[in-house]
Amino acid sequence: MPQNTLNIVILAAGKGTRMYSKMPKVLHRIGGKPMLGRVIDTAAALNPQNICVVVGHGKEQVLDTVKRDVVWVEQTEQLGTGHAVKTALPHLAAEGRTLVLYGDVPLIDVETLKTLLEAAGDKVGLLTDVPTDPTGLGRIIRDGNGSVTAIVEEKDASTAQKAVKETNTGILVLPNAKLENWLNSLSSNNAQGEYYLTDLIAKAVSDGIKVRPVRVRASHLAAGVNNKLQLAELERIFQTGQAQELLKAGVTLHDPARFDLRGRLKHGQDVVIDANCIFEGEIELGDNVEIGASCVIKNAKIGANTKIAPFSHLEDCEVGENNRIGPYARLRPQARLADDVHVGNFVEIKNAAIGKGTKANHLTYIGDAEVGSKTNFGAGTIIANYDGVHKHKTVIGNEVRIGSNCVLVAPVTLGNKVTTGAGSAITRNVEDGKLALARARQTVIEGWVRPEKDKQ
């Protein structure tokens, strides 16, 4: 097998006690994606021969959530990082190299790993850091010539060793030809009673194998997550990076510190996004789209020149050009709006196609419907689409005028240019051009006197 064969082992077996969560630590999300999923994506971008993910705590939940084409290996006992890599040995090539990554180090990037792999060659590669606070981290020990000789975990470190600022990130490149022998010779005679992967550095030095350290260019790239505070810190770093990329690409963000993208955002020119907006899944924004404050948009395509007013929620929907949406509007899955549509405050649309120029400006529910062009919904219109068992469709033609406080009881069809009187409950089809009234006739009672309270 060629010497440049690359295997990747991702360690993801830890419980994450300090997360105080029933969810396995590696499933907590950064940018809307499980941390482990992010690490697998980065690993896959290196085109390795295979990727082995070592799981343990919450194995079934991890496999159910992160559905990837990788080799899943179970570590039944959590006996340390060295033991975890050892469980993956049967799936690693006899030759080549193994890169060790971690499922709770979500921001490691391809550029950093390529630099490490290039520096390591066929020797040992070690990614190091000089963090602001090295507390709790393993220290990099060097000799008088500056060569790395060992990694000492803080619990096993002397006072002098604890004074060292350079720390171990845990990310290693190891030659497969030596890996099995090194792992088999590990001892658990340490403060943790575990098999440390870091002890392989001293073994490499003992065998005359050069250790080539590479310092990570930014600490957050190799930062691990052990608690919710660290998770939140990395989330904000990640979101800041995404905001900066969008700003460089010409998107106006009124407050980059209050912007969240949990997916991918494709955009045209002169897009404006106000504060506190959340974008999830696949988003496409056309030219001159404006998104008001505190909107939540998930898996949506929004056409050019459309304005989304504050506090609107859009999910799994498609919006045409020159639309006016909100404030406080809700577009639910399968809402499909043509061009020049107006959807106002407290209007909800679900599984409905809305034709060009149609308006529903106030307090309206449109569900399971097909609506033509230039139709107007009066305030308080409700499409009653559910009979308690089944959903039914409503068809509304072009240039229909629906009076305020009407109920359209599906299944029902209103032809073109139909008008319905305010307060009507429409239960039968209405032909083109007709006026439909379905309400009780008003009665005025002559001589009626309103009761008064007893003044005594």
From Swiss-Prot:
UDP-N-acetyl-alpha-D-glucosamine binds at residues 11-14, 25, 75, 80-81, 102-104, 138, 153, 168, 226, 332, 350, 365, 376. Binds 1 Mg(2+) ion per subunit. InterPro entries: Bifunctional_GlmU (IPR005882), GlmU-like (IPR050065), GlmU_C_LbH (IPR038009), Hexapep (IPR001451), MobA-like_NTP_Trfase (IPR025877), Nucleotide-diphossugar_trans (IPR029044), Trimer_LpxA-like_sf (IPR011004). SUPFAM superfamilies: Nucleotide-diphospho-sugar transferases, Trimeric LpxA-like enzymes. Acetyl-CoA binds at residues 379, 385-386, 404, 422, 439. One of its GO terms (molecular function) is glucosamine-1-phosphate N-acetyltransferase activity. Residues 1-228 are annotated as: Pyrophosphorylase. In the N-terminal section; belongs to the N-acetylglucosamine-1-phosphate uridyltransferase family. This is Bifunctional protein GlmU.
